[in-house]
């Protein structure tokens, strides 16, 4: 490579000159009198600068580690190789090493990409497989990053400079500490000042040397850095061992004094009993948050539960003695230790916390369980449970302060269950957070009514129900359950019996003149009071019968509000009486229904309009044919999608074939009473004698019009129309259907085309 190593001093030589010059620098470092001065001069200011390329940056979990660094290096090299295959190149950088730390500067722009002070660099490793690559770990706690760098030449000089940098900084700090030590020695010494100074020195050594020692003591480098630096390495290793001993002492002191070993091992039990508060604080080191579920991790059940028990032993030494008398283990582990008897007993208590201590199964006695509760609930909850186990437990403190129950779960879970049991009948049904799935069985059985009450809260009618007296919420629950059974008459009784309870407004609301008004006084009638529940459920669940009912209502827009309920009640049950009741309503509106506005939908109009038009034929006195057809039309009206049109067309054209000679005179005489206007009579008179071709063409138009009106196209009407075209009298239907199509093409053409044919042809031959 033609890349050169550049420094602020005379370091701009190729590899051949840099190789012999490196030992000279190391020889200078041997002399302790020159090392610090030379290194300070070397790293002062901008320091040393090396040309390199940035392989990549990777987040790493730890501050140091050979295996971690190697894995990260291989990962970044693989990513760089993949990028190179796509035409990407590594970023060219300058690595600047100075007293301020390591700076990564972009070669082109000169911008400082990354800057890491010395105290943030925790590990430096040279790649074993590539002598031109190295990496270092930097960053704060939890934010460690591994920077992989490919140097232009050998990476060894750069790594040596980094070691020199850390050594210089360490020596400078050490000298400063020595000066402080001398100044402190010259001053008047107080009692224990020397011990404090030694502790400070050790702490300073930790601060200064930990990074340095862990940096190079854990370095993943081969023994290339050998002869000149062995003495220094030995010194660093000695300091490292000293630091390790100090760290171990600092680590073991909290272990021994805080009694954490009592949590993990049963050996130092008396220490935990003498220092229970330290045991609890040390236990938090391993388990930062108290475990709400003591059975979540069985292997750690002992330390997890021993800590609260030892913490509770602060406030109740007498009950600690009682628990000691009831168990053969010390109080440090309490009744919650690995003893299977107390473990099983606690399990029974957790699973049977419904206020029935006698239901605890197994050979575990009741008094020992009571002592257990006393031991575990020393934080103020035992005063509630020791007397009568659940008698004094009031639900209001639990409802007011749920976090207190979560802070120390071993004691409050029992009070939680007792308060839930005592407040099961209250209107405020608060389900506590699922601390454990096992006591949930008793909770579910005890709060079945409360769960139903919460389930009914989904509807807006329940909050007013709570405003009623305390005994009332049980009644709306059964009413809501009855409403969902689909029985319309079932909820009528309870809804009427509720009186002022605002449960009925959403049901009767849709049938009031104002659709969204929730007042119950709008529908007090006997006819409507029986119907709102049956119509409420289709509206809520979006079923089609209720929608069709409201779609058909525009045809009866003029009648007053009381008649529609009587009309709509049979229509939902689809009884024959419905159409008989619609006939008196359809008669007065015959003249209006023949030419309604075209905005009416064809789906909503055919049934009421057919009923109204079918009611018109009885006006002429000799209508025997229509009387025979009325019951058949009524039954076909019940099924609008049936074969009604097929029957009408067949009968109509059957009459055509029989009555061909007398059609014209009978039609002229009977068109006025059939309910048609003068425009239709003139239209029929004009159409008499039209050639057969036009008649056939009109037949085809009428057939298309019938097919448009009837959603399911029937082949029978088409054949009937084709047979009717052979007759010369078939022109009666076709012009008539055209007339209706011109005046009202969307709605009335179907019923009007059926009845006028039936009425004029039924008179002569009936």
From Swiss-Prot:
PTM comment text: Phosphorylated on serine residues in response to mitogenic growth-factor stimulation. Phosphorylation during mitosis is leading to membrane displacement.
Keywords for this protein = Acetylation, Apoptosis, Coated pit, Cytoplasm, Cytoplasmic vesicle, Developmental protein, Differentiation, Endocytosis, Membrane, Nucleus, Phosphoprotein, Protein transport, Transport, Wnt signaling pathway
Q: Where in the cell is it found?
A: Cytoplasmic vesicle, Clathrin-coated vesicle membrane; Membrane, Clathrin-coated pit
Name the SMART domains on file: PTB (SM00462)
Positions modified as Phosphotyrosine? 170
Show where the record puts the motif DPF 1: 293-295
Q: Where is this motif: DPF 2?
A: 298-300
Required for interaction with MYO6 as annotated region, ranges? 647-766
Residue ranges of the region described as Required for interaction with CSK? 617-625
Q: Where is this region: Sufficient for interaction with SH3KBP1 SH3 domain?
A: 707-723
Q: What residue spans carry the region label Required for interaction with GRB2 and CSK?
A: 661-669
Q: Name one GO cellular component term.
A: cytoplasm
Matching Gene3D superfamilies: Pleckstrin-homology domain (PH domain)/Phosphotyrosine-binding domain (PTB) (2.30.29.30)
Q: Which residues form the PID domain?
A: 45-196
* Described function: Adapter protein that functions as a clathrin-associated sorting protein (CLASP) required for clathrin-mediated endocytosis of selected cargo proteins. Can bind and assemble clathrin, and binds simultaneously to phosphatidylinositol 4,5-bisphosphate (PtdIns(4,5)P2) and cargos containing non-phosphorylated NPXY internalization motifs, such as the LDL receptor, to recruit them to clathrin-coated pits. Can function in clathrin-mediated endocytosis independently of the AP-2 complex.
Q: What is known of its domains?
A: The PID domain binds to predominantly non-phosphorylated NPXY internalization motifs present in members of the LDLR and APP family; it also mediates simultaneous binding to phosphatidylinositol 4,5-bisphosphate. The Asn-Pro-Phe (NPF) motifs, which are found in proteins involved in the endocytic pathway, mediate the interaction with the EH domain of EPS15, EPS15R and ITSN1.
Recorded protein name is Disabled homolog 2
Species the sequence originates in: Mus musculus
């Amino acid at each position: 490579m033609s890349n050169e190593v550049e420094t602020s001093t005379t370091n701009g030589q190729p590899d051949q000159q840099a190789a012999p010059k490196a030992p000279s620098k190391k020889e200078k470092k041997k002399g302790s009198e020159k090392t610090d001065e030379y290194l300070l001069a070397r790293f002062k200011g901008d320091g040393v600068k090396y040309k390199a390329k940035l392989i990549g940056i990777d987040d790493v979990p730890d501050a140091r580690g050979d295996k971690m660094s190697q894995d990260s290096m291989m990962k970044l090299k693989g990513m760089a190789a993949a990028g190179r295959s796509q035409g990407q190149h590594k970023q060219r950088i300058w690595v600047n090493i100075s007293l301020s730390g390591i700076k990564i500067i972009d070669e082109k722009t000169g911008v400082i990409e990354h800057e890491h002070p010395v105290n943030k660099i925790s590990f430096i490793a040279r790649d074993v497989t590539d002598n031109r690559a190295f990496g270092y770990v930097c960053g704060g706690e939890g934010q460690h990053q591994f920077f992989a760098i490919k140097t232009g030449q050998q990476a060894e000089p750069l790594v040596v400079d980094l070691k020199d940098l850390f050594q210089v900084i360490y020596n400078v700090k050490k000298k400063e500490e020595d000066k402080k030590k001398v100044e402190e020695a010259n001053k008047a010494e107080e009692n224990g000042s020397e011990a404090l100074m030694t502790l400070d020195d050790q702490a300073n050594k930790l601060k200064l040397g930990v990074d340095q020692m862990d940096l190079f003591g854990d370095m993943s480098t081969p023994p290339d850095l050998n002869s000149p630096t062995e003495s220094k390495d030995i010194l660093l290793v000695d300091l490292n061992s000293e630091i390790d001993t100090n760290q171990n002492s600092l680590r073991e002191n909290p272990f021994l004094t805080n009694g954490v070993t009592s949590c993990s091992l049963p050996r130092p039990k008396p220490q935990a009993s003498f220092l229970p508060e330290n045991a609890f604080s040390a236990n938090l080191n391993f388990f930062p948050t108290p475990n709400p579920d003591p059975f979540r991790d069985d292997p750690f059940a002992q330390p997890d539960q021993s800590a609260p028990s030892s913490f509770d032993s602060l406030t109740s030494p007498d009950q600690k003695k009682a628990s000691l008398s009831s168990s053969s283990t010390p109080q440090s582990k309490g009744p919650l230790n690995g003893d299977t008897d107390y473990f099983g007993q606690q399990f029974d208590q957790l699973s049977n916390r419904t206020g029935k201590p006698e239901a605890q199964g197994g050979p575990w006695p009741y008094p020992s369980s009571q002592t257990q509760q006393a031991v575990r609930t020393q934080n103020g909850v035992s005063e509630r449970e020791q007397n009568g186990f659940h008698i004094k437990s009031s639900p209001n403190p639990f409802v007011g302060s749920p976090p207190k129950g979560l802070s120390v779960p071993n004691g409050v879970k029992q009070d939680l269950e007792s308060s839930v049991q005592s407040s099961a009948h209250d209107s405020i049904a608060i389900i506590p957070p699922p601390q454990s799935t096992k006591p949930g069985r008793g909770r579910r059985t005890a709060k079945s009514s409360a769960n139903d009450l919460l389930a009914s809260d989904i509807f807006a009618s329940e909050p007013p129900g709570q405003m009623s007296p305390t005994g009332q919420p049980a009644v709306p629950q059964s009413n809501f359950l009855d409403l969902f059974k689909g029985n319309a008459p079932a909820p009528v009784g309870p809804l009427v019996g509720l009186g002022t309870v605002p449960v009925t407004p959403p049901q009767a609301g849709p049938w009031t003149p104002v659709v969204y008004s929730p007042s119950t006084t709008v529908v007090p009638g006997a006819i409507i009071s029986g119907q709102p529940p049956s119509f409420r459920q289709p509206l809520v669940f979006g079923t089609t019968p209720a929608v069709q009912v409201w779609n058909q209502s525009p045809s009866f827009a003029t009648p007053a509000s009381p008649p529609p309920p009587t009309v709509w009640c049979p229509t939902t049950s689809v009884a024959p009486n419905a159409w008989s009741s619609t006939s008196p309503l359809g008669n007065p509106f015959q003249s209006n229904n023949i030419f309604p506005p075209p905005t009416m939908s064809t789906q909503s109009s055919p049934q009421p309009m057919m009923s109204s038009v079918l009611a018109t034929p009885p006006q002429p006195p000799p209508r025997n044919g229509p009387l025979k057809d009325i019951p058949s039309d009524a039954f076909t009206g019940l099924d609008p999608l049936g074969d009604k049109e097929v029957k009408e067309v067949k009968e109509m054209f059957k009459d055509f074939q029989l009555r061909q000679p007398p059609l014209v005179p009978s039609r002229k005489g009977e068109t006025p009473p059939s309910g048609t206007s003068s425009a239709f009579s003139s239209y029929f008179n004009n159409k008499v004698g039209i050639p057969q071709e036009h008649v056939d063409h009109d037949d085809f138009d009428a057939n298309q019009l019938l097919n448009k009106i009837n959603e399911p196209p029937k082949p029978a009407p088409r054949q009937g129309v084709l047979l009717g075209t052979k007759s010369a009298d078939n022109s009666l239907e076709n012009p008539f259907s055209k007339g209706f199509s011109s005046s009202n093409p969307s709605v009335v053409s179907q019923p009007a085309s059926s009845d006028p044919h039936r009425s004029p042809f039924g008179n002569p031959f009936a």
